């Protein structure tokens, strides 16, 4: 899982690979609270992109978490002030 740009000000594009099957991507804040569910569905194997619009969330560190079958990956993302 990766994202660009990083740091970002209002939105970032998250790219992820899946081996197929159920895929969950969430964004968590520095306290571990889920602030966004970006996708929660079945995907065929492949590489995908999804946009995270941070809206009114404060600047700071966030984490994109990918769960696919038994795989979990976490990507740190920094929201900067505009």
Where does each model-flagged region fall?
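C-terminal outer-membrane/trafficking sorting elements
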Residues: 1-4, 8-82
């Amino acid at each position: 899982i990766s994202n660009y740009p990083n740091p970002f000000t209002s939105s970032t594009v998250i790219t992820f690979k899946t081996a197929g099957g159920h895929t969950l991507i969430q964004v968590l804040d520095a306290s571990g609270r889920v602030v966004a569910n970006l996708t929660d569905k079945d995907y065929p194997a492949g590489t995908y992109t999804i946009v995270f619009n941070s809206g009114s969330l404060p600047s700071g560190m966030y984490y994109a978490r990918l769960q696919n079958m038994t795989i979990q990956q976490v990507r740190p993302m920094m929201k900067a002030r505009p």
